[in-house]
Amino acid sequence: MSYSCSTRNCSSRRIGGEYAVPVVTVSSPEADCLSGIYLPSSFQTGSWLLDHCQETCCEPTVCQSTCYQPTPCVSSPVQVTSRQTTCVSSPCSTTCSRPLTFISSGCQPLSGVSTVCKPVRSISTVCQPVGGVSTICQPTCGVSRTYQQSCVSSCRRIC
């Protein structure tokens, strides 16, 4: 199943530091929404915190039960990624919009609006600590939740 990415906007900062990288924007129908953040390779290290990321993806014309496919995160075991993903399902006119915060060390936010996150191969809810970042790995759901259960029940991002 293919997805097309219409826009992608990200900014970055060092963990525990000030903003040091300007906003990076990718606008291309060929861009893969699910493969990671478009940043120069020198910034794709464990010392960078990627935040304020927003992706707009278009699903096929059939309403799907998942908003996006499971894909691996950036390979660095200490990479912290915070992104807000908007999935639009047509013809269901369903919008799934929620920020996800996770550490790419085998943690996965679970389906739906669950605030539980667990490492893929363990029942523990504690993830590897990264600097001053909280050791609890969980998706952060926004105040505004526009969910339609039929389309979003298994919406998840696996890293």
UniProtKB/Swiss-Prot annotation:
One of its GO terms (molecular function) is structural molecule activity. Pfam families: PMG (PF05287). Keywords: Keratin, Repeat. Wool. GO terms for cellular component: cytosol; keratin filament. InterPro entries: Keratin_matx, KRTAP_PMG. Sequence repeats lie at residues 107-116, 117-126, 127-136, 137-146. It comes from the Eukaryota. Residues 107-146 are annotated as: 4 X 10 AA approximate repeats. In the wool cortex, wool keratin intermediate filaments are embedded in an interfilamentous matrix, consisting of wool keratin-associated proteins (KRTAP), which are essential for the formation of a rigid and resistant wool shaft through their extensive disulfide bond cross-linking with abundant cysteine residues of wool keratins. The matrix proteins include the high-sulfur and high-glycine-tyrosine keratins. Belongs to the PMG family. This is Keratin-associated protein 11-1. It comes from Capra hircus.
